[in-house]
Amino acid sequence: MPTHFRVMTSGLRIAVLCVGAVLLGATGAQADECPKDKVLAHNHDIEWKDDVGIRRKTLTIVDLTGWREIGDLRMRMRRLTIPPGGIIPTHEHTDRPSLVYFVKGEAIEHSSACDVPIVHRAGESDTEWGPYRHWWENKTDSDVVLIGVDIVPPDFLDDPKTDEPN
C-alpha cells in the first residue's frame, strides 16, 4: 500500500474516532446553550474582537475532495488553547460547520443569536453552524483547551509555520 494512502487512512481513522467522540461527548453532556427566553428572533450586532493569545495545533486533516461530490474541502481537527485573558476572535459558521469538545477549563461565548453570554465547560460538546457570529473568551486563571473539527476550503487551513508545537 502506498505511504500516502496509509497516512490518509490513519488520519481518517483518527478523524472519524474523534468526530464520533465529539458527537457523543465524552461525558454525554451538551454544552450550555442560550436560554430559550434569551434566543433572539434576529441576530444583534456584537463586538468584533481580535485574536488574543490563541494557540492552534492542527492534529489531522482529511482531504474530502471528490468524496460524494463534496468539492474541494477538508475536514480539519485542531487543538485550540485559550490562555487566561485570551480571546478566540469574532467569526461566523454560515459556511463552516464545526464540532467542539471542551477538554479543559471554562470559556464564555458571546453570540449574535443570544442576548446573554453562554458558558462552556470541560467535558461538554457543542455544534457551531448557521448564520450567526460569535467570539469566546477565557476569564479564568488557567488555560481552556478544546478540540475542534470543521469542514473548510484549503485556504482556511492554518499556516504550519504558526502552528503550536506538539
Label the predicted regions.
Residues 2-4, 28-76, 117-119, 126, ...:
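A short, N-terminal "cap"/entry segment at the start of jelly-roll beta-barrel domains
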Residues 2-14:
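Bacterial Sec-dependent N-terminal signal peptides
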Residues 11-25:
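Bacterial N-terminal signal peptides
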Residues 70-73, 86-99:
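A short beta-loop-beta micro-motif enriched in histidine and acidic residues
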Residues 82, 113-131:
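Short acidic-glycine-tyrosine-enriched beta hairpin
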Residues 88-93, 111, 118, 137-139:
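Short histidine-centered beta-strand/loop micro-motifs
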Residues 95-114:
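Glycine- and acidic-residue-biased ligand/ion/polar-headgroup-sensing regions
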Residues 121, 130-156:
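Ligand-binding loop in jelly-roll beta-barrel domains
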